[in-house]
UniProtKB/Swiss-Prot annotation:
It is found in: Cytoplasmic vesicle, Secretory vesicle, Synaptic vesicle membrane; Basolateral cell membrane; Endoplasmic reticulum membrane; Golgi apparatus membrane. Ca(2+) 2 binds at residues 976, 1038, 1040, 1046. Residues 128-171, 642-694, 1299-1324, 1343-1405 are annotated as: Disordered. The N-terminal first 124 residues can be classified as C2 domain, based on their 3D-structure. They are not sufficient for calcium ion or phospholipid binding. GO terms for biological process: membrane fusion; regulation of neurotransmitter secretion; sensory perception of sound; synaptic vesicle exocytosis. This is Otoferlin. Changing residue 1323 to K: In a breast cancer sample; somatic mutation. CDD domains: C2A_Ferlin, C2B_Ferlin, C2C_Ferlin, C2D_Ferlin, C2E_Ferlin, C2F_Ferlin. Residues 1-98, 236-357, 400-531, 944-1069, 1115-1242, 1464-1593, 1714-1865 form the C2 domain. The lineage of its organism: Eukaryota, Metazoa, Chordata, Craniata, Vertebrata. Signal peptide: none annotated. Residues 1370-1383 have a biased composition (Basic and acidic residues). It comes from Homo sapiens.
Amino acid sequence: MALLIHLKTVSELRGRGDRIAKVTFRGQSFYSRVLENCEDVADFDETFRWPVASSIDRNEMLEIQVFNYSKVFSNKLIGTFRMVLQKVVEESHVEVTDTLIDDNNAIIKTSLCVEVRYQATDGTVGSWDDGDFLGDESLQEEEKDSQETDGLLPGSRPSSRPPGEKSFRRAGRSVFSAMKLGKNRSHKEEPQRPDEPAVLEMEDLDHLAIRLGDGLDPDSVSLASVTALTTNVSNKRSKPDIKMEPSAGRPMDYQVSITVIEARQLVGLNMDPVVCVEVGDDKKYTSMKESTNCPYYNEYFVFDFHVSPDVMFDKIIKISVIHSKNLLRSGTLVGSFKMDVGTVYSQPEHQFHHKWAILSDPDDISSGLKGYVKCDVAVVGKGDNIKTPHKANETDEDDIEGNLLLPEGVPPERQWARFYVKIYRAEGLPRMNTSLMANVKKAFIGENKDLVDPYVQVFFAGQKGKTSVQKSSYEPLWNEQVVFTDLFPPLCKRMKVQIRDSDKVNDVAIGTHFIDLRKISNDGDKGFLPTLGPAWVNMYGSTRNYTLLDEHQDLNEGLGEGVSFRARLLLGLAVEIVDTSNPELTSSTEVQVEQATPISESCAGKMEEFFLFGAFLEASMIDRRNGDKPITFEVTIGNYGNEVDGLSRPQRPRPRKEPGDEEEVDLIQNASDDEAGDAGDLASVSSTPPMRPQVTDRNYFHLPYLERKPCIYIKSWWPDQRRRLYNANIMDHIADKLEEGLNDIQEMIKTEKSYPERRLRGVLEELSCGCCRFLSLADKDQGHSSRTRLDRERLKSCMRELENMGQQARMLRAQVKRHTVRDKLRLCQNFLQKLRFLADEPQHSIPDIFIWMMSNNKRVAYARVPSKDLLFSIVEEETGKDCAKVKTLFLKLPGKRGFGSAGWTVQAKVELYLWLGLSKQRKEFLCGLPCGFQEVKAAQGLGLHAFPPVSLVYTKKQAFQLRAHMYQARSLFAADSSGLSDPFARVFFINQSQCTEVLNETLCPTWDQMLVFDNLELYGEAHELRDDPPIIVIEIYDQDSMGKADFMGRTFAKPLVKMADEAYCPPRFPPQLEYYQIYRGNATAGDLLAAFELLQIGPAGKADLPPINGPVDVDRGPIMPVPMGIRPVLSKYRVEVLFWGLRDLKRVNLAQVDRPRVDIECAGKGVQSSLIHNYKKNPNFNTLVKWFEVDLPENELLHPPLNIRVVDCRAFGRYTLVGSHAVSSLRRFIYRPPDRSAPSWNTTVRLLRRCRVLCNGGSSSHSTGEVVVTMEPEVPIKKLETMVKLDATSEAVVKVDVAEEEKEKKKKKKGTAEEPEEEEPDESMLDWWSKYFASIDTMKEQLRQQEPSGIDLEEKEEVDNTEGLKGSMKGKEKARAAKEEKKKKTQSSGSGQGSEAPEKKKPKIDELKVYPKELESEFDNFEDWLHTFNLLRGKTGDDEDGSTEEERIVGRFKGSLCVYKVPLPEDVSREAGYDSTYGMFQGIPSNDPINVLVRVYVVRATDLHPADINGKADPYIAIRLGKTDIRDKENYISKQLNPVFGKSFDIEASFPMESMLTVAVYDWDLVGTDDLIGETKIDLENRFYSKHRATCGIAQTYSTHGYNIWRDPMKPSQILTRLCKDGKVDGPHFGPPGRVKVANRVFTGPSEIEDENGQRKPTDEHVALLALRHWEDIPRAGCRLVPEHVETRPLLNPDKPGIEQGRLELWVDMFPMDMPAPGTPLDISPRKPKKYELRVIIWNTDEVVLEDDDFFTGEKSSDIFVRGWLKGQQEDKQDTDVHYHSLTGEGNFNWRYLFPFDYLAAEEKIVISKKESMFSWDETEYKIPARLTLQIWDADHFSADDFLGAIELDLNRFPRGAKTAKQCTMEMATGEVDVPLVSIFKQKRVKGWWPLLARNENDEFELTGKVEAELHLLTAEEAEKNPVGLARNEPDPLEKPNRPDTSFIWFLNPLKSARYFLWHTYRWLLLKLLLLLLLLLLLALFLYSVPGYLVKKILGA
């Protein structure tokens, strides 16, 4: 569907100049090219094309403007041509020559010649002439099929055609045809038509023709992006998406988990910090740490909530650090940090991991940073799957500044700001007292006062403030402001403003409004601070009639959708950044309430009179409970129209009209004569007359409106802020269009329709056009006086965003290719989210409209329509989407009544026409109604024709027949206790309903029934009904023999309409069957496959209707089957069923299942399994494979479900249903023959080589260890040999495509001469844990690499095309290759040694694979050939029951299916190895019972849910398998939430009887039963029989001894031989040494192995292992084998379904008992910490600050002592003796500390075992970082000692001490200078000077002293051999320090005293005096000797 404008010439122009033309239609403009130096005539000759999605209306306009073009100044308008398209719509082709008009609408001489063509998509108007635009008839057919191909990019300016070049016709046709048909279509030469204009630039077309001629797919060529589709391809519009049940407000389960790891840089001296974690009102505390500014906690807290999402996300998470908290005192707050839960939930994975929270003091905002707390915060809702980063081996090397606990985009330095919430006044409050109380009051007081005492309360960031109470006022006036102080930007998204009624007993909320700060601010470069109003906000809540116990009170609190207007509040908000340096600033963050400056009445906008009109065209589906009393519908807007409980006052003052208003109305609208002077004569009519409903069927009633449709109209007065709503509407229109397009594309991808990329281009084109249109429309009314600052800023922001979005859409459009559709679709989803966000206007104006159904004057059900959706504008884009349209509304119950099953029934379905606009625009209010009515006025008489009608009488009506083709449904809701249902469908259309037949006991009914609705009368014009037919409602019910039918779900559809004059032929008819999603509340409840057509009955009656030609072979009596042409085309398929066995069958009616059988049914055909004679003894079937043939649709999407039912055969021929399962999609079981058209191997190899050269950085030389693909002469795939070489000197793991220098950095088994600088780890020192931690490092690094690249599944699919070529590269190695490549880049960019340091540190250790998830998710549930089907019984639970599908599972059927078309081609059946016994199921092992040794290794658990009151748990492992139940209760781990178990358990089991392994974690309790924390279940049987060989993981290397010993009893060569035999693969052929050939692959590798004694022996195991690790590359039989691994499984608790209770790391090995016995289990017991002794000698101190003043002299001195500890102040604190009266800050100690400790090297943690409190039963193990704390103190005799300074040394990495005190600086400790870091565990002995620091008054670090210390680390054995004494004691005592004797007395030692008191203080003064004295002496000598000398000189002596 498109409109083409051919602009030919503009003539009679005046003067010479450059001309340009602008052509505008529907707001989208195209410019012509500039014609230079035109004189009289401008010959444009250009064609412009508009793809139009909706039919062109006959009233639409086309506008062409001609300008004089200027490069410098703006273009000057010459004239305008406007044309109404009525004639074009009727005739499809018009050519016009006409004059232009100027600005004043005066005709000018200049004329224009234009040709206009239009073709509607439905063919109702016009068709292209044979030779017009597309010449080829077949091409026209294709054009019709694809419906739309857009040929022109918006804004592209085609150049005019030079003579002699091909015409548009040929070029355009070849482009369109080539684009659409690709290589299947050849181009035909066409005769040239000289009069055809150019549409595309010729150069482009020539390039295009060259590119397309190559036979490539056109959509892979960038120039092909000119093909775009703007009309819907899928029939998505026929599926209206209507959600019935309110989702907001329903409580859900949430879990907030917070791990407090540590704190750093806490401000304060010698503090004892405790961290308090608050979520909402719940508080939890960590333990207290003494005397440290950087405490380490690692404590985990969990908070559980069951509340609605809105309440949850507004809760505040507060993390505070408190100093010296104990039982008696609450402690002093150091600092706190807060954010709301919603901020955390909106993060990726709903969590912050290892982030630092910045602490600030709320009581002193000028004090700055108070420290950091490192924590993990996660918020989990039910069903959320969170990827938790791995817990093990956390290092505390942290970049604090780069990892702050802040959402992305929030600056790290947040400033304090004041939030001023200004509350002005409120209006329209409801009365808040019962009428009884009101009468009592009146009796006592004697006057009727307003029955409400309102005040406003504001909640923000955990604080609240409230205004004063205005006594007895429905229209209170406050003019107050509530001031909050918080950091900006705040981490709390919403502010809650609530009007409350003050009451003696308890205050009640009247209404609530939430201010979303993101919507009233912008954080961009050109953004603005939050600002709002002054603007009115509307509040909604419960109905206005006051009752003491209001069941809907929650609605007034803002929970759930309000059902009635409550009040409106005039408020404003402003934010001011605070200058914290200002001395006058109040530094507290307490909420203040101040007076605010009053504002004028007109500030919020000029009051205008609005007019709302509505017409009820139909009211049906009225719930039968309301069917016995007359029903009326009431429409309200604000309090207007509410006659029951609306206005609190009887009279509302009319807004005064300004004097000029009347004249203005007179002039513009000529309305005043019609309205009899005063509009007050026009009384509002807000409700329909009461009418008694009539029966539709047993559930529903309808109102018999017939041709008389009741109307309502309401006048109301509101501030005129339409511009806000207009802008929101434009964006909504763009967003709706975009959403429709994206849904269409997703449907295309889902249903595999061709060319989704073309549709996406069309969507992007429409988006960019919409954005341009917004920019042109939104900038109106700039000078509006009542525009707030937010209006102005939002407009600028929206215009910037949409301009940017339009540009991005244009760029994306050019980039769309077939393989990038999914990526670009995601980007478009982001556009959609942004548009929806921008369109949500935060400043309200007109309240929403409520439609209430009243029965017996009581409110029953309601619908709410946003006013902006109904707002009228003369500009189409600004009009609300439902304005002047007939809208279908489904009325629902208010508040909580609408939850659950009560909300599923429709209360009423109303077809309603609504229009809202200014009274001045009232003449338009009937413009959208279906035509053919007469108005009925309320009053008669002259001058009343402008009065609105009270009802409409329709004289025009159309007769229709509806055919509902109900084919089948699938995955329906189980409504009976058997787990099945007896479903039937009821179809409602207008006032009629019909039912399908009932099908018993199925969840996938195939009704195959056509329902015909005759004698349907629809009112209005036929073409209107064609475009927008009424909605069909389909409800599915379960037939019950007793009681009424149970509701199972509902869906909606729109029929395809055929008019009487239309042919019933393709492409529109007959309609295609489609799936409609069935909803039950908000949950999906299956799919309905159906089609609906609405056929107009013409003058000839039903004879003209298409005949019903059903299948002739079936006679079903009165039931008409779906006719041919609509029912699917069937083909014969064979369904093979593998019956393996049944598992875990539960009792039926208390009786055990003994003789079960499985029945398989599909499309009426089926097969039964053999009977299991004794389920207890052997639950497997003895006949494995059976098959049946069935007719299935050709289209796989329409395949019916396959039903699996298990019955128990009882005595006397009875049988009982045990459970059932419906396979809703057979797709994954369909066998597809291999594709012979796969690209040839030559191409593959060529690509592979290219990949390798790229990966090797361009070098084509092959480094050792890479895969070399060589070609043998034979071409077929099977014969290709792949060489995988592995030299003895190279790695034991093939790393493919990795350059040599990267290889050096990888893990190796054997050392090489390549890396002399890297030490080999001593194998005797390594254990399994070394391997585990090395593997975790690798996993973490891989995850880190994946984060920035963000490869997700879709992208992975695309990458696979090339990745698949990379021979033997497994997933793990791919990731590692990428990791190494990235690391190499970062290192080369780094400098020298520093960048290589991390690489050198990593030792060469063999690794295993650590999976951060279950093994099943990595290997497709091990369902490679054996599938597990859960059998269900019992009713499906509803959300509110909290029941899950788990509870309905009564057993499992194991088997498989294979579906294929018959007969199979011979070559296919030969290649697939088809067998007459087992069919397609080849190589199936026997299912006889087998004994297996199961070995379970449980490594550790993480993040367990606390089970005890103290917030901890005492976990132990429990394992169940069959009858074996192991409880490892004795080895529980005390008070741990991250316990390391390190256990292995051996269990002998017999498959199939014992195949479900349960590993549970229990909490040990001293008293009472132990509680289950969580459990995980593993199906061992599927693992055992899987081709992935999950019995025992394949290790990375083969070793016969050491930590990496081979675990499997079978060696790699034996495993390889077995696999080749089972898979019928040729091989393995070993030899020569180090070489093996399997099928057509050759692997080479080391041929020797070293035994325990270091002897080298020849072996084939290395190459065999290499072949196993690349088994997926073996043709046909190859698949990925499970590597040696540890899997991480979530722990779940049945009591808390859907929420993880922690994670468990484990792996399972299985060994058949008939094979050689495996070796002893691996020892994975937790590493015992190693005992060490740290000896610290404190030699001296220097430059210690002097704290004490001497009593006599005032001299400064200090009594210094040094304190140190390693584990904690309480555990091992040690003090030196005191150096008294240090006058210089120098202290001499020679004092030794001894710290024995237990240390875990792998985790770099010290292990402490101690009782948590005196009441604790046992010791708890703690792990803390190895940090030595040294403090310097000033000793006082009477008062407490004074803390002077401290340093904390991390023993793994601390700065090397300075050699002298002078070289020791403060920067060594603060990290401001690069100091070499040392580890005491490597150096063993370190001596030096270290600085001691403390914070001054400004919270800045200052140097308070230096300490000379020596650290010496010994193991416990070494310490025992070489003992030393504590302090200065024996053995090996230290000598006494040589301290100056400062305990002197003046008169005994005056000189010494003088030295200390005078010299130290006045030494410089004394030196200067001495120097001066010497100079004076010298001068005196000179003067004394000069005379004598002079005399001698004179006398010449």
